[in-house]
């Protein structure tokens, strides 16, 4: 089941597929059993990148540190 269309936002934000995959893996570690929270956090991260609040590289670093 898909809750949020984070992939479209990621595409609009210019996030490369390999970077999105890396972000997905990191977020999945935080929410291994909760698909809705997993997708919500991905959507929020992609929106922050799209709006210029952060970059994909910064998002990957901050997720790794969490």
Model-derived regions, located:
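N-terminal acidic leader/helix
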Residues: 1-31
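Long, compositionally biased
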Residues: 35-66
């Amino acid at each position: 089941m898909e809750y949020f269309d984070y992939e479209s936002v990621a595409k609009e934000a210019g996030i490369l597929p390999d970077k999105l995959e890396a972000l997905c893996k990191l977020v999945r570690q935080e929410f291994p059993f909760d698909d809705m929270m997993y997708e919500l956090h991905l959507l929020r991260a992609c929106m922050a990148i799209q709006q210029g609040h952060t970059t994909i590289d910064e998002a990957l670093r901050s997720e790794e540190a969490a």
